[in-house]
Amino acid sequence: MIKTVLLFINLTLVIAQTPDKRGYIIKVGDNLPEFVMDFPDGSQINSVDLLGNVTMLQFTASWCSVCREEMPHIEKEIWKIYKNIGINVIGIDRDEPAEIVEKFAKEIKVTYPIALDPRADIFALFADRNSGVTRNIIIDTDGKIKFLTRLFDPKEYLEMKRVIHGLLENQFLEEKQTLVAQKQILKELKHKRTTDQNISTKNIEQKLFLLERKLNLKARRLSYAEKLL
């Protein structure tokens, strides 16, 4: 019985790590793996820190001609449009040192951050280590993988942009609901202040005012971005 269970577990692990026809070992609906990204400037980001925002991970390399074709589109049509709305766009360069990665970014004129993956260990969490780059992974605010691309197919790229926009709209609605809930709490505090003069709501009011202004700006930017899709 124990041998049967162990065999089943081993088979499950093998199936889970078997690449699909595009080389992916993860699929839509999976959780974002935990890993640490190092950047050419010496900074680090843990994948856990990405939660709470829509995230796009873009696997790339300077020797990849398809990446060079796709990345200016990502810069112009995703990063520059959505970076002030609440998206993480991070390139992950495999098998290359920091100086090459920095030169690469300048050559193709991208400003979103590019992390280092010198041994392709991060890449191998998502796809077969021996498969090619030019891959985008779209992750929602809860760390669920929502979309996967391979190479630079115009139809798939457009669908990816639509998925990103939809996720950002959902993120905006969640933030708006939070604001409504916080306003209700403020209202209750103001009511209590009639009996307890020690309760101060000034700081709360200021924070909610700034949040509302930020959300109004985000709504206008989302509306503008939708027209570009």
Q: What are these model-derived regions, one by one?
A:
Residues E34-T55, F126:
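A short beta-strand-turn-helix
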Residues I108-T111, P118-H165:
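Thiol/disulfide oxidoreductase modules built on the thioredoxin-like
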Residues W79-A120:
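Conserved segment of the thioredoxin-like fold in thiol-based oxidoreductases
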Residues L32, E169-L229:
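Non-globular targeting/processing and membrane-anchoring segments
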Residues F59-K76:
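Conserved redox-active cysteine motifs that mediate thiol-disulfide chemistry
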Residues I15-E34, L51, E175, K190:
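N-proximal helix/coil linker or "cap" segments that precede and/or mark the start of modular domains
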Residues I2-L13:
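Sec-dependent N-terminal signal peptides
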Residues M56-L57, V89:
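Hydrophobic beta-strand anchors of alpha/beta hydrolase catalytic cores
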